[in-house]
Amino acid sequence: MDSAACAAAATPVPALALALAPDLAQAPLALPGLLSPSCLLSSGQEVNGSERGTCLWRPWLSSTNDSPRQMRKLVDLAAGGATAAEVTKAESKFHHPVRLFWPKSRSFDYLYSAGEILLQNFPVQATINLYEDSDSEEEEEDEEQEDEEEK
């Protein structure tokens, strides 16, 4: 099902609305896919033997219609006059979902200022995942020893 079919599947516009605003008769009043349950479930897979189209774009799912990823171009910094930071930001391509790994020992730093600075300097939609590092394991062992001493 393509986007035109999704638009056709949406509920029809009442005649009174068309009479009041004839210019709107040519454009749909609702977004395609919002009113059609078949478009809501679409991601290109087969469900109940019928192939669904792609009405909603999901960046984490690749489809056959996607163009191949372009290779990063080599940029001559001297000729372009751009700094390395500007080139990195302009030429970088991210594969979503982006996951940033943050040590559990620094989780309180994230809650206050360091996490805010991290997200300002990394301006893409990303998920921060906490991981066990040597510092956080030592803290857990210290807490366990303190608990044992209290008993």
Swiss-Prot record:
Name of protein: Protein ripply1
Gene giving rise to this polypeptide: RIPPLY1
Positions of transmembrane segments: none
Entry keyword set: Developmental protein, Nucleus, Repressor, Transcription, Transcription regulation
Record region (Disordered): 130-151
Biological processes annotated in GO: embryonic pattern specification; negative regulation of DNA-templated transcription; negative regulation of transcription by RNA polymerase II; somite rostral/caudal axis specification; somite specification
CC terms in the record's Gene Ontology section: nucleus
Family according to the record: Belongs to the ripply family.
Claim: Cytoplasm is one of the keywords in the record: no
Domain remarks: The ripply homology domain is required for transcriptional repression. The WRPW motif is required for binding to TLE/GROUCHO proteins.
The organism of origin for this protein: Homo sapiens
Function: Plays a role in somitogenesis. Essential for transcriptional repression of the segmental patterning genes, thus terminating the segmentation program in the presomitic mesoderm, and also required for the maintenance of rostrocaudal polarity in somites.
Location of region: Ripply homology domain: 96-131
Extent of Acidic residues compositional bias: 132-151
Motif (WRPW motif): 57-60
Main subcellular location of this protein, as a coarse class: nucleus
Compartment list: Nucleus
PANTHER family: PROTEIN RIPPLY-LIKE, PROTEIN RIPPLY1
